[in-house]
């Protein structure tokens, strides 16, 4: 099984139309390469709120994803599953609820949970088994998924969320 991570400079809810267009092009290129390689997941970070309220950013992201699907269809790309990833900075779109909303709104979308990012956004709240089970319950209650793609590492965080990833040995 192959899982791919798309470029980090994707922003589905940018205030700049040119950045949205570039983001679409990056996702299309990722989907094309993923189809060639038989990737089962195409992981990406949804983007930054860009000083918008999260609800408005979500609305723009959904419109951008609709554009993405139109362009993928026009390109003849049919074999893909995008996997938006939870993000670590509080200025980024991508808390657990937002990832669930994106995935529940579109076919071919399944979540990626980066536990370090969730921990950083929550300013260090993943400390025991029950904390992790809470996330699993949210996913199970809202999405019909058979396979969950996750990342796990240690992370440095501050008031704004993620500062820096560290290796497990650090």
Indicate where each model-derived feature is located:
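Terminal, non-globular segments
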Residues: 1-2, 9, 16-21, 116-118
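Short beta-strand segments at enzyme active-site cores
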Residues: 2-6, 39-46, 152
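Acidic/histidine-rich catalytic cores of soluble enzymes
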Residues: 67-167
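Conserved radical SAM core fold
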Residues: 8-11, 48-51, 118-120, 157-159
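Active-site acidic/histidine proton-transfer and metal-coordination neighborhood
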Residues: 12-112
């Amino acid at each position: 099984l192959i899982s791919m991570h798309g470029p980090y400079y994707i922003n589905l809810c940018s205030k700049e139309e040119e950045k949205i267009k570039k983001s679409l092009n990056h996702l299309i290129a990722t989907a094309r390469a993923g189809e060639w390689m038989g990737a089962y997941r195409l992981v990406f970070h949804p983007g930054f709120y860009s000083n918008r309220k999260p609800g408005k950013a979500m609305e723009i992201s959904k419109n951008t994803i609709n554009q993405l699907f139109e362009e993928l269809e026009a390109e003849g790309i049919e074999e893909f599953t995008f996997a938006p990833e939870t993000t670590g900075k509080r200025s980024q779109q991508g808390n657990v609820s937002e990832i669930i909303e994106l995935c529940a709104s579109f076919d071919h979308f399944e979540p990626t949970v980066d536990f370090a990012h969730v921990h950083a956004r929550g300013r260090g709240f993943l400390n025991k088994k029950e904390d992790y089970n809470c996330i699993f319950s949210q996913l199970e209650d809202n999405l019909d998924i058979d396979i969950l793609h996750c990342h796990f590492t240690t992370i440095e965080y501050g008031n704004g969320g993620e500062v820096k990833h560290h290796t497990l040995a650090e």
